[in-house]
Protein backbone atom coordinates (compact mmCIF):
# COMPACT_ATOMS: atom_id res chain seq x y z
CA UNK A 1 0.00 0.00 0.00
CA UNK A 2 1.37 3.42 -0.98
CA UNK A 3 2.05 6.10 1.59
CA UNK A 4 -0.79 8.33 0.37
CA UNK A 5 -3.35 5.52 0.51
CA UNK A 6 -2.16 4.63 4.00
CA UNK A 7 -2.67 8.23 5.07
CA UNK A 8 -6.18 8.19 3.56
CA UNK A 9 -7.07 5.16 5.67
CA UNK A 10 -5.62 6.80 8.78
CA UNK A 11 -7.58 9.95 8.04
CA UNK A 12 -10.83 8.05 7.60
CA UNK A 13 -10.14 6.16 10.82
CA UNK A 14 -9.85 9.51 12.59
CA UNK A 15 -13.10 10.82 11.08
CA UNK A 16 -15.14 7.65 11.53
CA UNK A 17 -13.66 6.80 14.92
CA UNK A 18 -14.23 10.20 16.48
CA UNK A 19 -17.70 10.45 14.93
CA UNK A 20 -18.58 7.12 16.50
CA UNK A 21 -17.16 8.12 19.90
CA UNK A 22 -19.03 11.43 19.80
CA UNK A 23 -22.24 9.45 19.31
CA UNK A 24 -21.38 7.27 22.31
CA UNK A 25 -20.87 10.38 24.45
CA UNK A 26 -24.12 11.97 23.28
CA UNK A 27 -26.26 8.86 23.77
CA UNK A 28 -24.90 8.31 27.28
CA UNK A 29 -25.03 11.98 28.25
CA UNK A 30 -28.31 13.08 26.65
CA UNK A 31 -30.33 9.84 26.56
CA UNK A 32 -32.12 8.40 23.55
CA UNK A 33 -34.85 11.05 23.61
CA UNK A 34 -32.63 14.14 23.34
CA UNK A 35 -30.20 12.25 21.11
CA UNK A 36 -33.15 11.55 18.82
CA UNK A 37 -33.78 15.30 18.66
CA UNK A 38 -30.09 15.82 17.85
CA UNK A 39 -30.37 13.23 15.07
CA UNK A 40 -33.37 14.99 13.54
CA UNK A 41 -31.57 18.35 13.55
CA UNK A 42 -28.51 16.67 12.08
CA UNK A 43 -30.61 15.67 9.08
CA UNK A 44 -30.56 19.32 8.06
CA UNK A 45 -26.77 19.34 8.18
CA UNK A 46 -26.62 16.17 6.10
CA UNK A 47 -29.02 17.66 3.55
CA UNK A 48 -26.89 20.79 3.16
CA UNK A 49 -23.75 18.69 2.91
CA UNK A 50 -25.27 16.45 0.23
CA UNK A 51 -26.17 19.50 -1.88
CA UNK A 52 -22.66 20.91 -1.47
CA UNK A 53 -21.08 17.59 -2.40
CA UNK A 54 -23.20 17.21 -5.53
CA UNK A 55 -22.72 20.81 -6.74
CA UNK A 56 -19.08 21.35 -5.74
CA UNK A 57 -17.29 18.51 -3.94
CA UNK A 58 -17.94 15.67 -6.38
CA UNK A 59 -17.39 17.79 -9.53
CA UNK A 60 -14.11 18.97 -7.99
CA UNK A 61 -12.84 15.42 -7.48
CA UNK A 62 -13.92 14.48 -11.01
CA UNK A 63 -12.78 17.54 -13.00
CA UNK A 64 -9.59 18.52 -11.17
CA UNK A 65 -7.54 15.49 -12.33
CA UNK A 66 -8.66 16.12 -15.92
CA UNK A 67 -7.51 19.76 -15.98
CA UNK A 68 -4.31 20.59 -17.91
CA UNK A 69 -1.54 21.56 -15.51
CA UNK A 70 -1.52 25.16 -16.69
CA UNK A 71 -5.26 25.60 -16.12
CA UNK A 72 -5.60 23.73 -12.84
CA UNK A 73 -4.84 26.69 -10.47
CA UNK A 74 -7.41 28.93 -12.15
CA UNK A 75 -9.96 26.11 -12.01
CA UNK A 76 -9.44 25.74 -8.25
CA UNK A 77 -9.74 29.51 -7.86
CA UNK A 78 -13.11 29.49 -9.61
CA UNK A 79 -14.33 26.48 -7.63
CA UNK A 80 -13.34 28.20 -4.36
CA UNK A 81 -15.34 31.31 -5.22
CA UNK A 82 -18.37 29.23 -6.11
CA UNK A 83 -18.07 27.48 -2.74
CA UNK A 84 -17.89 30.79 -0.86
CA UNK A 85 -21.04 32.01 -2.63
CA UNK A 86 -22.76 28.74 -1.76
CA UNK A 87 -21.71 29.17 1.89
CA UNK A 88 -23.16 32.68 2.06
CA UNK A 89 -26.50 31.65 0.56
CA UNK A 90 -26.67 28.59 2.80
CA UNK A 91 -26.05 30.67 5.95
CA UNK A 92 -29.02 32.91 5.15
CA UNK A 93 -31.31 29.99 4.30
CA UNK A 94 -30.40 27.92 7.35
CA UNK A 95 -30.74 30.81 9.80
CA UNK A 96 -34.17 31.73 8.43
CA UNK A 97 -35.52 28.20 8.04
CA UNK A 98 -34.36 26.88 11.40
CA UNK A 99 -35.58 30.03 13.16
CA UNK A 100 -39.09 29.51 11.78
CA UNK A 101 -38.89 25.81 12.64
CA UNK A 102 -38.01 26.56 16.27
CA UNK A 103 -41.08 28.75 16.61
CA UNK A 104 -43.27 25.72 15.87
CA UNK A 105 -41.24 22.96 17.58
CA UNK A 106 -42.33 22.30 21.15
CA UNK A 107 -39.11 20.69 22.36
CA UNK A 108 -37.45 22.18 25.49
CA UNK A 109 -34.11 20.61 24.56
CA UNK A 110 -33.85 22.89 21.51
CA UNK A 111 -33.73 26.11 23.56
CA UNK A 112 -30.69 28.18 22.66
CA UNK A 113 -29.80 26.14 19.57
CA UNK A 114 -30.56 28.65 16.79
CA UNK A 115 -27.08 30.18 16.46
CA UNK A 116 -25.00 27.03 17.17
CA UNK A 117 -27.06 24.88 14.78
CA UNK A 118 -26.67 27.45 12.01
CA UNK A 119 -22.94 27.68 12.72
CA UNK A 120 -22.56 23.89 12.67
CA UNK A 121 -24.39 23.33 9.38
CA UNK A 122 -22.61 26.16 7.53
CA UNK A 123 -19.11 25.49 8.85
CA UNK A 124 -19.31 21.74 8.28
CA UNK A 125 -20.20 22.06 4.61
CA UNK A 126 -17.41 24.61 4.06
CA UNK A 127 -14.97 22.29 5.79
CA UNK A 128 -16.15 19.42 3.56
CA UNK A 129 -15.16 21.45 0.48
CA UNK A 130 -11.76 22.41 1.91
CA UNK A 131 -11.17 18.77 2.78
CA UNK A 132 -12.15 17.58 -0.70
CA UNK A 133 -9.77 20.15 -2.19
CA UNK A 134 -6.92 18.54 -0.23
CA UNK A 135 -7.66 15.15 -1.77
CA UNK A 136 -8.12 16.63 -5.25
CA UNK A 137 -4.64 18.18 -5.03
CA UNK A 138 -3.02 15.11 -3.49
CA UNK A 139 -2.37 16.81 -0.13
CA UNK A 140 -3.57 13.94 2.01
CA UNK A 141 -1.33 14.83 4.95
CA UNK A 142 -2.88 18.29 5.06
CA UNK A 143 -6.38 16.75 5.09
CA UNK A 144 -5.35 14.53 8.00
CA UNK A 145 -4.05 17.51 9.99
CA UNK A 146 -7.29 19.43 9.40
CA UNK A 147 -9.40 16.45 10.43
CA UNK A 148 -7.34 16.05 13.60
CA UNK A 149 -8.14 19.66 14.38
CA UNK A 150 -11.86 19.36 13.65
CA UNK A 151 -12.94 15.99 15.03
CA UNK A 152 -10.81 14.88 18.02
CA UNK A 153 -10.94 18.44 19.36
CA UNK A 154 -14.74 18.31 19.44
CA UNK A 155 -14.66 14.86 21.06
CA UNK A 156 -12.32 15.98 23.85
CA UNK A 157 -14.35 19.10 24.65
CA UNK A 158 -17.66 17.21 24.62
CA UNK A 159 -16.21 14.54 26.91
CA UNK A 160 -14.98 17.15 29.39
CA UNK A 161 -18.37 18.89 29.50
CA UNK A 162 -20.12 15.51 29.90
CA UNK A 163 -17.82 14.55 32.78
CA UNK A 164 -18.93 17.72 34.56
CA UNK A 165 -22.61 16.87 33.97
CA UNK A 166 -23.19 20.04 31.95
CA UNK A 167 -23.69 18.74 28.40
CA UNK A 168 -26.84 20.02 26.69
CA UNK A 169 -28.03 20.01 23.09
CA UNK A 170 -27.10 23.67 22.61
CA UNK A 171 -23.60 23.15 24.00
CA UNK A 172 -23.18 20.11 21.76
CA UNK A 173 -23.79 22.19 18.65
CA UNK A 174 -21.58 25.02 19.93
CA UNK A 175 -18.71 22.56 20.26
CA UNK A 176 -19.29 20.87 16.88
CA UNK A 177 -19.72 24.15 15.03
CA UNK A 178 -16.80 25.79 16.80
CA UNK A 179 -14.40 22.95 16.01
CA UNK A 180 -15.41 22.94 12.33
CA UNK A 181 -15.02 26.73 12.15
CA UNK A 182 -11.52 26.59 13.64
CA UNK A 183 -10.54 23.93 11.10
CA UNK A 184 -11.89 26.11 8.26
CA UNK A 185 -9.87 29.11 9.44
CA UNK A 186 -6.76 26.94 9.57
CA UNK A 187 -7.40 25.61 6.05
CA UNK A 188 -8.22 28.81 4.17
CA UNK A 189 -4.70 30.35 3.99
CA UNK A 190 -3.31 27.37 2.07
CA UNK A 191 -6.32 26.49 -0.06
CA UNK A 192 -5.67 25.82 -3.75
CA UNK A 193 -6.60 28.73 -6.00
CA UNK A 194 -6.17 31.43 -3.37
CA UNK A 195 -4.61 34.53 -4.91
CA UNK A 196 -4.96 33.16 -8.45
CA UNK A 197 -7.09 34.72 -11.18
CA UNK A 198 -10.04 32.34 -11.58
CA UNK A 199 -11.53 30.91 -14.71
CA UNK A 200 -14.85 32.40 -15.71
CA UNK A 201 -17.24 31.72 -12.85
CA UNK A 202 -20.07 31.47 -15.33
CA UNK A 203 -18.28 28.84 -17.41
CA UNK A 204 -17.08 26.87 -14.39
CA UNK A 205 -20.50 27.05 -12.78
CA UNK A 206 -22.14 25.93 -16.02
CA UNK A 207 -19.69 23.03 -16.28
CA UNK A 208 -20.40 21.99 -12.70
CA UNK A 209 -24.13 22.35 -13.27
CA UNK A 210 -23.99 20.28 -16.44
CA UNK A 211 -22.30 17.57 -14.44
CA UNK A 212 -24.25 18.00 -11.22
CA UNK A 213 -27.78 18.89 -12.31
CA UNK A 214 -28.77 15.27 -11.94
CA UNK A 215 -26.61 14.83 -8.84
CA UNK A 216 -28.31 17.78 -7.14
CA UNK A 217 -31.72 16.30 -7.82
CA UNK A 218 -30.34 12.96 -6.74
CA UNK A 219 -29.17 14.49 -3.45
CA UNK A 220 -32.69 15.69 -2.71
CA UNK A 221 -34.11 12.32 -3.71
CA UNK A 222 -31.47 10.49 -1.67
CA UNK A 223 -32.23 12.59 1.39
CA UNK A 224 -35.93 11.77 1.33
CA UNK A 225 -35.36 8.13 0.39
CA UNK A 226 -32.80 7.57 3.15
CA UNK A 227 -34.68 9.40 5.87
CA UNK A 228 -38.39 8.82 5.18
CA UNK A 229 -38.55 5.85 7.54
CA UNK A 230 -36.52 7.67 10.21
CA UNK A 231 -38.82 10.70 10.09
CA UNK A 232 -41.89 8.45 10.10
CA UNK A 233 -40.53 6.66 13.18
CA UNK A 234 -39.92 9.97 14.95
CA UNK A 235 -43.38 11.29 14.06
CA UNK A 236 -45.31 8.12 14.93
CA UNK A 237 -43.17 6.54 17.65
CA UNK A 238 -41.38 9.56 19.16
CA UNK A 239 -37.85 10.98 19.26
CA UNK A 240 -36.49 8.04 21.34
CA UNK A 241 -37.28 5.70 18.42
CA UNK A 242 -35.29 7.95 16.08
CA UNK A 243 -32.50 8.01 18.65
CA UNK A 244 -32.42 4.21 18.83
CA UNK A 245 -32.19 3.96 15.04
CA UNK A 246 -29.38 6.50 14.76
CA UNK A 247 -27.48 4.97 17.68
CA UNK A 248 -27.60 1.59 15.94
CA UNK A 249 -26.58 3.18 12.65
CA UNK A 250 -23.50 4.75 14.21
CA UNK A 251 -22.24 1.40 15.45
CA UNK A 252 -21.93 0.43 11.79
CA UNK A 253 -19.62 3.42 11.41
CA UNK A 254 -16.69 1.01 11.29
CA UNK A 255 -17.67 0.41 7.67
CA UNK A 256 -17.57 4.14 6.94
CA UNK A 257 -13.81 3.89 7.07
CA UNK A 258 -13.81 2.03 3.78
CA UNK A 259 -16.75 3.93 2.29
CA UNK A 260 -15.31 7.38 2.88
CA UNK A 261 -11.84 6.32 1.81
CA UNK A 262 -13.35 5.16 -1.47
CA UNK A 263 -15.09 8.50 -1.98
CA UNK A 264 -11.77 10.30 -1.62
CA UNK A 265 -9.53 7.93 -3.59
CA UNK A 266 -11.55 5.90 -6.09
CA UNK A 267 -13.13 8.80 -8.08
CA UNK A 268 -9.69 10.31 -8.77
CA UNK A 269 -8.12 6.94 -9.66
CA UNK A 270 -11.10 5.95 -11.82
CA UNK A 271 -11.05 9.25 -13.72
CA UNK A 272 -7.32 8.92 -14.40
CA UNK A 273 -7.69 5.31 -15.59
CA UNK A 274 -10.57 6.22 -17.89
CA UNK A 275 -8.64 9.12 -19.40
CA UNK A 276 -5.31 7.29 -19.74
CA UNK A 277 -6.21 3.64 -20.43
CA UNK A 278 -9.81 3.64 -21.63
CA UNK A 279 -13.12 2.02 -20.79
CA UNK A 280 -11.94 -1.60 -20.46
CA UNK A 281 -9.35 -0.81 -17.78
CA UNK A 282 -11.80 1.49 -15.99
CA UNK A 283 -14.52 -1.18 -15.84
CA UNK A 284 -12.06 -3.82 -14.65
CA UNK A 285 -10.91 -1.52 -11.83
CA UNK A 286 -14.46 -0.78 -10.61
CA UNK A 287 -15.52 -4.43 -10.88
CA UNK A 288 -12.59 -5.56 -8.73
CA UNK A 289 -13.36 -2.98 -6.06
CA UNK A 290 -17.06 -3.88 -6.10
CA UNK A 291 -16.46 -7.63 -5.77
CA UNK A 292 -13.77 -7.60 -3.08
CA UNK A 293 -15.37 -4.79 -1.12
CA UNK A 294 -18.78 -6.44 -1.18
CA UNK A 295 -17.39 -9.66 0.27
CA UNK A 296 -15.52 -7.81 3.02
CA UNK A 297 -18.55 -5.66 3.90
CA UNK A 298 -20.85 -8.69 4.01
CA UNK A 299 -18.47 -10.56 6.31
CA UNK A 300 -18.14 -7.68 8.77
CA UNK A 301 -21.89 -6.99 8.72
CA UNK A 302 -22.71 -10.64 9.39
CA UNK A 303 -20.45 -10.68 12.43
CA UNK A 304 -22.03 -7.52 13.83
CA UNK A 305 -25.56 -8.83 13.24
CA UNK A 306 -24.85 -12.15 14.98
CA UNK A 307 -23.33 -10.50 18.06
CA UNK A 308 -25.56 -7.40 18.00
CA UNK A 309 -26.45 -7.25 21.70
CA UNK A 310 -22.89 -7.94 22.80
CA UNK A 311 -21.60 -5.15 20.55
CA UNK A 312 -24.22 -2.69 21.77
CA UNK A 313 -23.57 -3.48 25.44
CA UNK A 314 -19.89 -2.72 24.89
CA UNK A 315 -20.71 0.63 23.34
CA UNK A 316 -23.85 1.94 25.07
CA UNK A 317 -23.72 0.20 28.44
CA UNK A 318 -26.81 0.99 30.46
CA UNK A 319 -29.08 2.25 27.65
CA UNK A 320 -29.37 -0.80 25.35
CA UNK A 321 -32.85 -2.19 24.66
CA UNK A 322 -34.42 -4.64 22.20
CA UNK A 323 -35.13 -1.83 19.72
CA UNK A 324 -31.44 -1.04 19.39
CA UNK A 325 -30.57 -4.73 18.88
CA UNK A 326 -33.15 -5.09 16.11
CA UNK A 327 -32.01 -1.80 14.60
CA UNK A 328 -28.37 -2.87 14.51
CA UNK A 329 -29.23 -6.11 12.71
CA UNK A 330 -31.22 -4.22 10.10
CA UNK A 331 -28.43 -1.67 9.69
CA UNK A 332 -25.95 -4.50 9.10
CA UNK A 333 -28.01 -5.59 6.09
CA UNK A 334 -28.43 -1.98 4.98
CA UNK A 335 -24.69 -1.33 4.88
CA UNK A 336 -24.03 -4.22 2.49
CA UNK A 337 -26.39 -2.53 0.03
CA UNK A 338 -24.85 0.87 0.79
CA UNK A 339 -21.41 -0.35 -0.25
CA UNK A 340 -22.76 -1.47 -3.62
CA UNK A 341 -24.48 1.88 -4.12
CA UNK A 342 -21.31 3.82 -3.26
CA UNK A 343 -19.15 2.01 -5.82
CA UNK A 344 -21.71 2.15 -8.62
CA UNK A 345 -22.35 5.86 -8.06
CA UNK A 346 -18.63 6.53 -8.40
CA UNK A 347 -18.66 4.65 -11.70
CA UNK A 348 -21.60 6.58 -13.13
CA UNK A 349 -20.16 9.91 -11.97
CA UNK A 350 -16.82 9.15 -13.63
CA UNK A 351 -18.61 8.35 -16.89
CA UNK A 352 -20.57 11.60 -16.40
CA UNK A 353 -23.86 9.70 -16.83
CA UNK A 354 -25.46 10.92 -13.64
CA UNK A 355 -28.94 10.94 -15.18
CA UNK A 356 -29.06 7.17 -14.63
CA UNK A 357 -28.36 7.59 -10.92
CA UNK A 358 -30.95 10.36 -10.68
CA UNK A 359 -33.64 8.20 -12.30
CA UNK A 360 -32.87 5.32 -9.94
CA UNK A 361 -33.05 7.62 -6.93
CA UNK A 362 -36.34 9.11 -8.06
CA UNK A 363 -37.91 5.66 -8.37
CA UNK A 364 -36.49 4.62 -5.01
CA UNK A 365 -37.58 7.85 -3.35
CA UNK A 366 -41.14 7.44 -4.58
CA UNK A 367 -41.32 3.97 -3.05
CA UNK A 368 -39.80 5.13 0.26
CA UNK A 369 -41.94 8.26 0.67
CA UNK A 370 -45.17 6.48 -0.22
CA UNK A 371 -44.53 3.40 1.91
CA UNK A 372 -42.81 4.83 5.02
CA UNK A 373 -45.84 6.01 6.98
CA UNK A 374 -48.12 2.99 6.34
CA UNK A 375 -45.29 0.52 6.98
CA UNK A 376 -44.36 2.16 10.30
CA UNK A 377 -48.02 2.43 11.30
CA UNK A 378 -48.54 -1.28 10.56
CA UNK A 379 -45.28 -2.78 11.81
CA UNK A 380 -43.98 -0.14 14.23
CA UNK A 381 -40.26 0.08 14.94
CA UNK A 382 -39.50 -3.15 13.06
CA UNK A 383 -41.17 -1.72 9.97
CA UNK A 384 -38.99 1.40 10.22
CA UNK A 385 -35.62 -0.35 10.44
CA UNK A 386 -36.31 -3.15 7.97
CA UNK A 387 -37.97 -0.65 5.64
CA UNK A 388 -34.72 1.33 5.62
CA UNK A 389 -32.75 -1.82 4.77
CA UNK A 390 -35.18 -2.82 2.01
CA UNK A 391 -35.07 0.67 0.52
CA UNK A 392 -31.27 0.54 0.23
CA UNK A 393 -31.48 -2.94 -1.26
CA UNK A 394 -33.88 -1.69 -3.92
CA UNK A 395 -31.55 1.17 -4.79
CA UNK A 396 -28.56 -1.16 -5.11
CA UNK A 397 -30.54 -3.48 -7.38
CA UNK A 398 -31.63 -0.61 -9.66
CA UNK A 399 -28.09 0.74 -10.02
CA UNK A 400 -26.61 -2.71 -10.59
CA UNK A 401 -29.14 -3.35 -13.36
CA UNK A 402 -28.23 -0.06 -15.06
CA UNK A 403 -24.50 -0.69 -14.60
CA UNK A 404 -24.76 -4.03 -16.36
CA UNK A 405 -26.67 -2.42 -19.20
CA UNK A 406 -23.97 0.24 -19.51
CA UNK A 407 -21.27 -2.44 -19.42
CA UNK A 408 -22.86 -4.39 -22.26
CA UNK A 409 -23.22 -1.26 -24.34
CA UNK A 410 -19.58 -0.32 -23.76
CA UNK A 411 -18.37 -3.79 -24.66
CA UNK A 412 -20.29 -3.79 -27.91
CA UNK A 413 -19.20 -0.31 -28.88
CA UNK A 414 -15.55 -1.03 -28.14
CA UNK A 415 -15.60 -4.20 -30.23
CA UNK A 416 -17.25 -2.53 -33.20
Predicted regions and their residues:
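Interfacial segments at transmembrane-helix termini and the short loops linking adjacent helices
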Residues: 100-116, 306-336
